[in-house]
């Protein structure tokens, strides 16, 4: 695995690419998983939790995962990277500039993700890294269900 020192902006900028990584491992979306998320968050809307009603009342014909459930599953789908950032004391999750739920994730499907380095820049606090990640329903790889830009600051 190639290592990049967190404050070597020029070397890190070589990671910026329009090309996405290989697909991550797959995560199965089960009704039990959706129900647990609904209980945890209090979002028990029938579109997510009532398979019988969703068969006839939903435009999708089934229950679907919460958009935020899809988002929080990202750490389970991290693909193996060919590089790592080293030499920093702290790494902060600085937030996101973009989050879009662009497709439906039906219960019973599997999802996977892939990403790319979108931006590297120096800031007064450290090195900012913007990662763009797309989550897709397996077998529907032409259109993502989720687009997310995650920002880290390495200090």
PLM features: residue spans?
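Short, surface-exposed secondary-structure edge patches
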Residues: 61, 102-103
